[in-house]
Amino acid sequence: MNTLNAENSLVLIIDIQERLVGALDKDIVVSKAVKVASAAKALSIPVVVTEQYPKGLGNTVEPLKAVLPENTEIVEKTSFNALLEDGMKERIASYGKKQIVIFGIETHICVHQTAAALLEEGYDVYVIKDACASRNKYEFKQGIEAMQQNGVKVSCVEIALFEWLKGAKNPKFKEVQALIK
């Protein structure tokens, strides 16, 4: 199946941190990330967050941290590919989800390398393009293109949310729809 299913999804948020968003159009990427995280919380979709060297780059930005589900795991990392961190492959596998929805900073480095590794592990990987960013538009474009060429499905916030909902009869429809108005 090529559409997202809330029961089979895990959200992986990559490095949306205090010092990394400063060089970006942070209002857009943070607001989009908040929408996906809020929808995941409403739909009981598990969320894992990574932080690249938080001692130097700061923690996850507060507006995003404020909407994360209570059981969200925040994983410190130094590898660009999050799956290279000790126990990360096992942590993701422990959720038993086949679809990984990934987004964050920087598109062409950490998001790209992690998405490639997830594909190699056999996951269906969906990148939320409008919730990703790079300091440079060219690198952003190349990162998205490289992921797509590798087999990652490129999506956006609204597509993901409405695929998770499936229809207006979903009991969480109004709550999730309100996130994009």
Task: Give each language-model segment a name.
Residues 16, 52, 130:
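Active-site loop/turn elements of alpha/beta-hydrolase fold enzymes
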Residues 1-10, 43, 55-181:
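Active-site-adjacent betaalpha module
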Residues 7-22:
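Generic N-terminal amphipathic, Lys/Arg-enriched alpha-helix
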Residues 19-22, 28-50, 54, 62-66:
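A positional/architectural concept
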